[in-house]
């Protein structure tokens, strides 16, 4: 054994004799620490001399190796670890003071000379450390007997892996925290401090308990009206407290409180309040009433009496019996409220219930006459009447005409408060207003299949300052969008969701696609866009409302003094992108991809060049509405007596292509996008396999052929070569269409939708084919409602 067999350094203290105070080989230098030297001094390995559990383990392992005659391993083990050593003299003294097990005495006559003789107090098989070693040895032997191919498999690797749970929870940075930025979580810090300090309300001992701080804090975050809060604690008042002397105590627990009055009987009359408190409260409430477009109360009760029924939450009014509004304790009652100008009668959002410190009431401004029309500006009849009869429109607005519409009294509709923007895009509110027809403006009705007028109608009047006649001021129109930025922010979110999110529905569509092709490289003439889903996380109703709102804003700009061309071009760009995705076309950054997938049925229009060009294009929208009204008055016999119920919003919206308004009365003409017979035969034979007699499936979105020209017109309009190629292909397609129209029998085998005398395509095809067309999977290509193509 070399000098490194025993791991002791020069000058270090070797193992002692377990409290005997004698160093076994302290007189042996480092150069003399060899196996011969140790043997001459009769050193042995003993578990009794172990200083710690590590040395105890090494001693038993060494004993186990020697006992089982693993001499080579024991020799290597003795070189690498530090085992407890002692001399024979010390062992003799230990034996005298220790009861040893005779079974632990072993014969080491055949031990090699290079090994030390172990002398253990316990046998190796009696120690738990050696039992662990035996278990590991058995496991190692088992692993050595398994082929390497089996060990490399994933199944066997999982057996040796130990699952360790993390101490800290997993914090995913992409997942937002579960915190709702609502009114119930936004509490005034000053109010928190007042509640923490406690109120100065004196309470009689033995009658009521004092409210705890947790009750006050929990109740302070409750921003509901008082009559909807818990009865145990309302606005910081202790249970059983009927009233307080000042209204300030009801609103925010601020100010000095007098001794409250506790009523044992419900029928007992409340004490008389001071006149100054009533006048102060009346002035505050009158200012809140003006925020909803109503006048201040005319008469206040001069007797300063509060009826006992007011404690039960009843607000009595002589002139109005439409509804009774609950009233908080300590507030005055009104004898009369002007019914002609008030929109708050019967509404649960009265200032008494919400309190004057409500942020919705503080940010509320008087609605204009146009916003009081409650969504009627989306109706084309109403817009035409406004243009043809401006004096009548001015007369109506001068009279401040009111309509009994649910959203007229709602604080989140028709307001300039940016915090209420989310209400305007709420699909639940849209379904509520679309559930039944309501009277709007000029006698028109909205149905469940039409775009939401309740949630979208007022949207166009929500941005920008307005004059007394309801039209936007041109000086503040673009600035309002720059300041509020609400619509553009929502549109940006929608764009990001549409372009960046790869949803599970997209993968499902790829699996179910019979051609196993993606929509971006698939010919649009063979796409079944009903099976193409919207991206996960986007709302169809939101996209529809966004399109409707942008179209309303553009239509509204005609009655105003103009609109910034740059701003309107941004509108058109976003509308075109939203419409293309709604129709299933998706977004493409390279405009040349459009030619690869669409063929020759494309033409690009130039963007605005001047404000005069913009005005001319806007005037074409009005004429298109008139043409639509004439076409939709009488049903046509060519389409089976079916009348096309098209809403004007999409009528004008789909005429927008490449940043320019295009006037077209024949919007659904089959000449745009219809391939000839040779192209059909080639397409059917290559993509459908062997059967050419299948019905040809045109794109479900019949708006794509003529109106939605480009995927990214901002790039295409700048590429002159692309525009030139598009015009050239357009001329070629026109010749093909003329030939196809001259010989209609050439396309008789294809059930491409016919058009009536007005140029409007019928969803059910020609007269001879009354049934709906189906694709190879049996799915209907043409729904009953043509707006289902836009997921509307």
Curated annotation (Swiss-Prot):
GO cellular component assignments: cytoplasm; nucleus
Region (Disordered): 1-34, 197-377, 397-477, 624-707, 734-792
Biased composition (Basic and acidic residues): 428-437
Domain LisH per the UniProt entry, residue ranges: 53-85
GO biological process terms on file: regulation of biosynthetic process
Key word Nucleus present: yes
Family of this protein: Belongs to the MSS11 family.
Protein name as annotated: Transcription activator MSS11
Organism: Candida glabrata (strain ATCC 2001 / BCRC 20586 / JCM 3761 / NBRC 0622 / NRRL Y-65 / CBS 138)
